[in-house]
A protein has these predicted regions:
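Non-catalytic accessory segments flanking enzymatic or RNA/DNA-binding domains
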Residues: 1-292
Length: 292
């Protein structure tokens, strides 16, 4: 059976996927999880998830398959972190690696990410990553604001736009979770709000709004319906039929209801991937409509 570690999860243009590393065999397997029924059981032991190549966007396993000590904050060991060489707040000092210097000199975009009418975030990413960065964050709609020749030029725009009242530079996962489980999203409404913000607040010309929901779930009714927060969330199991994933929140259907369960804290942990088994049952308050 071997020891398996969840080394990555994300939503691509082909939907939600996870990567499982077999630590004994030294192999990594990608799994498309939408439409699959499973339970992921998390164990306390943690291992390095490996390095990421900023230029090719490729991930590689940690050669030593390094175990991570208790209380260690990162998901990569120091050697793999050095190999990656990424410092997201490069503009605050702290040194820039050769890898990051090369990456910073590639074209970057400034984007507006929409989470709710009151939660608009401005950020930057390399033009090569573009939409994938938006999907990683779980934005529901988005708009590209500027195309710049480098990260430095993009960062100047980001700093300027983020100083605007009511515009976020970052959003906590707990806020994203609350919005996902309490707010309904309408792309037409989001588009109108983004256009107005870009034109009136930023003084820029709006570009075409991007609808991101179609990547999170193939079934439109999933995100159009209610996403529930379980009354009894588990910190060690995510279970059910996976009907999509928004950012790092897996959408798991049980007994006809869809629950959001965060997988972010499972990354770097040893896990059991129990295919076809539902080993944990979520519960939630009755639907409002059923009270009458």
């Amino acid at each position: 059976l071997g020891r398996h570690m969840l080394s990555w999860l994300g939503v691509g243009f082909d939907g939600p996927r996870i990567a499982l590393d077999d630590l004994d065999e030294g192999t990594r397997t990608m799994h498309s999880i939408e439409g699959e029924t499973f339970t992921i059981v998390k164990h306390p032991e943690r291992f390095c998830v490996g390095a990421y190549n900023l230029m090719t966007q490729e991930r590689e396993m940690c050669e030593r398959r390094q175990e991570l000590p208790d209380g260690y904050k990162e998901t990569s060991c120091p050697a793999c972190a050095d190999k990656t060489g990424f410092n997201p707040s490069f503009y605050n000092g702290g040194g820039i690696s050769a890898q990051q210097r090369a990456y910073n000199d590639t074209p970057h975009i400034v984007y507006l990410a929409y989470f709710s009418p009151r939660h608009l975030k401005v950020g930057i990413t390399s033009a090569a990553r573009g939409k994938l960065r938006l999907l990683e964050q779980g934005a529901r709609s988005a708009m590209i604001l500027k195309e710049c020749e480098s990260a430095y030029a993009a960062r100047e725009w980001e700093a300027k736009l983020c100083s605007t009242q009511g515009i976020y530079e970052s959003l906590l996962p707990s806020v994203k979770y609350r919005l996902l489980t309490t707010q309904t999203h309408d792309h037409a409404e989001a588009s109108a709000i983004m256009r107005k913000t870009v034109r009136d607040t930023f003084g820029l010309e709006p570009t075409d709004p991007i609808d991101l929901d179609r990547y999170y779930s193939r079934d439109e009714s999933v995100l159009a319906g209610s996403i529930n927060e379980p009354d009894n969330p588990s910190s060690t199991m995510v279970a059910g039929e996976c009907v999509g994933m928004v950012g790092t929140f897996a959408l798991m259907r049980q007994q006809g209801r869809v629950y959001a369960a965060s997988l972010k804290d499972y990354v770097s942990h040893l896990v059991d991937y129990r295919f076809g088994e539902v080993l944990y049952e979520y519960s939630a308050p009755p639907e409002q409509g059923s009270l009458f």
